[in-house]
Amino acid sequence: MTEPDPRTLEALGLAEAPREHPLSYPGARPEESVLLDGDRLLPLTRRLCEDRVPVLAVGSNACPAQLRHKMAQSGVSGTIPMVKTRVFGLGVGVSAHVSPMGYVSASPFHAPGAVGELFLTWLDAAQLAVVDASEGVTVAEGAYGRAWLSASDVRVELDSGELLPGAHVYVNRRGVLHNGSGSPRPHPGERPLLASLLAGSARLRELFGETPEEFCARARGDGALCARGTRLFASEGLAMASGLERYA
């Protein structure tokens, strides 16, 4: 009898995609740099891929299962190098919009002096087109624009020590949510985020229910309701600029 492959996403506990399980957002991610090969994670033998486009993964695009889902749905190759990086000058906040996927996603903001760890994905042209479409880059009313951040603005250091001249990142066109004191609110994970947002807004509860589970169930697939939630973030004064608008 053939032994099961220990390198599959299922075997590694990384098979759950936030697109199918919104409360799992941003999704589980690897502990180290890997090569995503469809349903498997393989050792990554090189960190620089000059024939591909470097894209920082701020939210669920660092989740192998989410990437697998997006590529498989579009019939595009699911082989993607994923490199762990240290990023200087960028923070991870909360998008000022409700996604029809059923969650409130992450979005970057300008954070001089900040240092954090993010995955960088190296995408080929077809993969980049898939991710662009999934983020709404190609439509005027889409949630995100894709921005190029040069090393003079945001420094990206690969886990092998190389510094990149720059990288792309998806910036939310509606800004990010603030923490009540004028600073961007960090994304704590979907369940605690939704619980806090619902507790703080009676109008949000009217639209999406009392619990994170109700929020996800109502939001998922209902673009009109999500648009109302997005407008509510703005009308209640919860949104602020990310500081990255000039790049997108």
Set out the residue ranges of the language-model regions.
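Glycine-aromatic micro-motifs
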Residues: M1-A248
